[in-house]
């Protein structure tokens, strides 16, 4: 789309006039990508001025438009540097240049389209908002330096920001990105801020969230319903919050994307109290530490993990806790891992620094968890705070800059130098994934994919880009459904309304029910769960349309045959929206449905039953079950009443965790498998040389992985004695190796000429298994894809659904269910 030429131009924003020699040329450039809210127009202004070019730059809803005039060589250098020198937060996707007639110089400045200097023009609004919205990013080093510089006028200003840092996604209401279209519209700039805003030599030139102590926003502290006297002064508010935290209070802290609940990380009683208030169970809390040096004292952090911790995204990074780290056991019960993050907002930096003139020490580590009950959405509005924080927090460190779109913290692991996303949210969302390969150069319909039931995100496509939402959460409550609907409305208002929808084919998913209600006359594509996982992986790597084999291991997914899948080997060809199930884990009964998911001992008993192993009392899952429970399960399994056939690898991990007496009941999803991985990781080096465990996961001729021999071998090993070679950790490690061996064997058997393999699904958050499978497959000559952009768990599901729907729209003769 050609960008509009403005009908009138504002006064130039300070640049010297240049005479126009003969031989000049003029070009119109349209720049797309992440180019709004990142200081791109000021950058273009500085670049054009440096090269002695004239013209203008502006935003419309879909792009940055530029008209620039000067010598051809300078224009070429200008176009090249648009990419090479772009601002840190910008991502230039495409630059389209068109030669247009030159405009003669007008020394009097009377020609509105050709002033004698390069300048920024007003933004223009189009019907559809195609430009990507930038994510929120951490405060930059320059702003941190000013925050603690007594000579700077923004000294200790909790909302300091510039064009290179700060909130974007959470404050944008509409595009183009200008201050009136953000939540900063309520804070008129003071004269000094306005001067900086209009000065092209200033770092805050056209920085929309610009503010200072004179023009707000304001920070305050309160206990209960009453503000504490004098705490509307920044230092008094910070000092009061530090004091409350030191005394053992839980303090709600309003951040960029919502409220956190903060407390001392070293106080067992306080952490337990917070866990009780949130109804958290045993799921670990994240810990925010003062700086990287502090983080290194708490955990073993390599250079790659340090780079992610200090990146602009500032995610929570899962790292190995150091022995003796001053962290309460209740922070991450039974886990050697800590989820650490560094301060990313000015308020965080102030909270971790001593207040001038105060003798109160600043904290060095705080539990920092979303302000919500478990399984509810994060608290982020003033109304939310009034209604929900009273039961969760003793005090609130608050401010009056509204949050328009909530956004939880992101969570990652670092595997061999690369990020493995666990939760993609703040710092990453809503950056788009390029799915141009799915559109094949044609106009693709905008699709809304509603994701899954757990770890929900949704995805909206716009042309060749797929926009994945921030983390929404588990769709088990009315509050989360409302948050989902609100987030969908915000995204579609920023972009465009979908003409097609996609959902998981599970008939009981709330997301599917919602999509069916909302579809009206629009097509709704029901996408098989594991197929969506595989396509999301191919999409993020730009490998759509290539033949591939997907190893898709997770806990639960509705199969095309109505059974529970989760141990799948799928093949796709040139049509990625079609798949063939070429292998799987053998089915066992899932007794009691969700009850078996919450109680790994039930899955262990089901696998023992399927393997023909008697439930003797020396077996841990038998000992962990009551007589009544055993009778019920025996009746269900023998009669096949209340049982669904299940081929889930996640449930096999649960069963083995229970059989090895690791975990029989869970407080949160994946707990048993996570603890099994920890046990196996600690033993992996020693167990690697142990030839005597005899654990194998055999693969039949038709690509079925049979767990029965493995279960029999585990029981035999457990009963053979307690010598070093049959320790439980060694068996846990041997089980991981057996699964990896089976994966390599089945893929080699079914792949034929295909050399591309993807590892996806929530089970591949298990780094020990991920590495083992990847190593074995590479040894056999396969190219192996793993997730780097969206999570392998259900948080990445919506991207795959969206792509399948886009492809189905282009190939209406087919559907998304399996072939053959």
Go through the PLM ranges and name each one.
Residues 118-502, 506-518:
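Active-site-adjacent structural elements in enzyme catalytic cores
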Residues 209, 216-217, 454-482, 486, ...:
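A contiguous, well-structured pocket-lining segment that forms one wall/lid of small-molecule binding clefts
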Residues 250-265, 365-377, 554-564, 640-663, ...:
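Conserved phosphate/anionic-ligand binding catalytic regions in large, soluble enzymes, centered on
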Residues 254-258, 503-506, 555, 649, ...:
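Glycine-rich beta-strand-to-loop/alpha-helix junction loops that act as flexible
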Residues 504, 521-533, 756-760, 767, ...:
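Conserved phosphate-binding/catalytic loops in two-lobed NTP-binding clefts
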Residues 530-553, 558-559, 600-609, 737, ...:
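Glycine-rich phosphate-binding/hydrolytic loop that grips phosphoryl groups
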Residues 543-610, 617, 638, 646-647, ...:
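Active-site histidine-anchored catalytic micro-motif
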């Amino acid at each position: 789309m050609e960008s509009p030429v403005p009908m009138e131009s504002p006064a130039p924003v300070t640049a010297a006039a240049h005479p126009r020699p003969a031989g000049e040329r003029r070009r119109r450039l349209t720049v797309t990508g992440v180019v709004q809210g990142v200081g791109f127009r000021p950058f273009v202004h500085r670049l054009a001025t440096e090269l002695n070019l004239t013209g203008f730059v502006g935003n419309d809803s879909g792009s940055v438009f530029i008209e620039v005039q000067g010598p051809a060589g300078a224009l070429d250098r200008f176009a090249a540097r648009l990419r090479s020198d772009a601002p840190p937060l910008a991502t230039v996707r495409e630059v389209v240049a068109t030669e247009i007639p030159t405009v003669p110089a007008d020394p009097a400045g009377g020609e509105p389209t050709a002033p004698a200097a390069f300048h920024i023009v007003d933004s223009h609004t189009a019907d559809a908002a195609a430009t990507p919205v930038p994510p929120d990013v951490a405060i930059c080093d320059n702003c941190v330096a000013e925050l603690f510089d007594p000579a700077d006028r923004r000294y200790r200003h909790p909302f300091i920001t510039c064009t290179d840092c700060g909130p974007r996604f959470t404050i944008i209401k509409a595009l183009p990105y200008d201050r009136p279209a953000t939540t900063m519209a309520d804070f008129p700039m003071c004269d000094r801020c306005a001067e900086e805003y209009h000065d092209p030599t200033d770092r805050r030139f056209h920085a929309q969230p610009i503010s200072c102590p004179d023009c707000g926003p304001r920070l305050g502290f309160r206990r209960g319903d009453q503000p504490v006297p004098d705490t509307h002064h920044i230092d008094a508010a910070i000092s009061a919050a530090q004091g409350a935290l030191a005394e053992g209070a839980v303090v709600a802290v309003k951040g960029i994307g919502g409220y956190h609940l903060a407390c001392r990380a070293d106080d067992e009683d306080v952490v337990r109290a917070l866990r009780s208030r949130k109804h958290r169970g045993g799921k670990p809390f994240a810990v925010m530490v003062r700086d990287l040096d502090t983080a290194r004292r708490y955990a073993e952090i390599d250079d790659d993990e340090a780079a992610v911790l200090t990146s602009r995204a500032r995610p929570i990074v899962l790292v190995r806790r150091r022995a003796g780290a001053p962290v309460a056991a209740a922070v991450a019960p039974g886990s050697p891992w800590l989820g650490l993050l560094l301060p990313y907002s000015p308020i965080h930096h102030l909270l971790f620094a001593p207040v001038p003139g105060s003798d109160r020490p600043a904290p060095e580590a705080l539990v920092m968890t979303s302000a919500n009950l478990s399984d509810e959405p994060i608290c982020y509005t003033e109304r939310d705070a009034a209604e929900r924080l009273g039961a969760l927090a003793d005090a609130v460190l608050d401010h009056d800059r509204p949050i328009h779109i909530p956004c939880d913290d992101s969570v990652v692991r670092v595997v061999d130098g690369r990020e493995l996303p666990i939760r993609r949210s703040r710092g990453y969302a809503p950056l788009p994934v390029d799915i141009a390969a799915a559109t094949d150069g044609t106009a693709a319909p905008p699709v809304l994919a509603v994701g899954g039931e757990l770890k929900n995100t949704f995805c909206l496509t716009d042309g060749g880009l797929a926009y994945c939402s921030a983390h929404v959460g588990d769709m088990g409550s009315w509050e989360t459904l409302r948050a989902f609907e609100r987030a969908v409305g915000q995204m579609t208002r920023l972009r465009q309304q979908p003409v097609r929808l996609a959902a998981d084919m599970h008939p009981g998913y709330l997301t599917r029910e919602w999509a069916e209600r909302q579809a009206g006359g629009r097509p709704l594509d029901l996408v098989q769960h594991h197929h969506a996982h595989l396509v999301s992986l191919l999409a993020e790597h730009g490998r759509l349309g290539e033949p591939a084999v997907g190893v898709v291991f997770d806990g639960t997914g509705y199969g095309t045959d109505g059974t529970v899948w989760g141990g799948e080997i799928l093949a796709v060809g040139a049509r990625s929206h079609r798949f063939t199930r070429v292998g799987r884990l053998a089915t066992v009964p899932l007794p009691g449905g969700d009850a078996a998911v919450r109680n790994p001992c039930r899955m262990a008993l089901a696998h023992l039953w399927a393997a023909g192993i008697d439930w003797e009392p020396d077996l841990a899952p038998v000992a962990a079950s009551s007589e009544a429970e055993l009778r019920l399960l025996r009746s269900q399994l023998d009669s096949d009443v209340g049982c669904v056939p299940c081929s889930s690898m996640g449930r096999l991990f649960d069963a083995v965790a229970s059989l090895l007496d690791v975990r029989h009941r869970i407080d949160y999803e994946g707990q048993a498998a996570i603890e099994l991985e920890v046990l196996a990781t600690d033993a992996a080096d020693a167990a690697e040389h142990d030839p005597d465990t005899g654990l194998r996961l055999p693969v039949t001729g038709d690509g079925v992985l049979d767990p029965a021999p493995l279960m029999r071998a585990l029981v035999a090993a457990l009963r053979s004695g307690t010598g070093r070679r049959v320790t439980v950790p060694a068996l846990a490690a041997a089980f991981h190796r057996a699964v990896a061996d089976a994966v390599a064997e089945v893929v080699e058997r079914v792949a034929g000429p295909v050399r591309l393999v993807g590892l996806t699904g929530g089970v591949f958050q298990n780094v020990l298994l991920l590495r083992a499978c990847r190593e074995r497959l590479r040894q056999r000559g396969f190219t192996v894809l793993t997730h780097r952009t969206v999570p392998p768990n259900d948080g990445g599901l919506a991207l795959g659904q969206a792509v399948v729907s886009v492809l189905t729209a282009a190939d209406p003769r087919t559907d998304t269910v399996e072939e053959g």
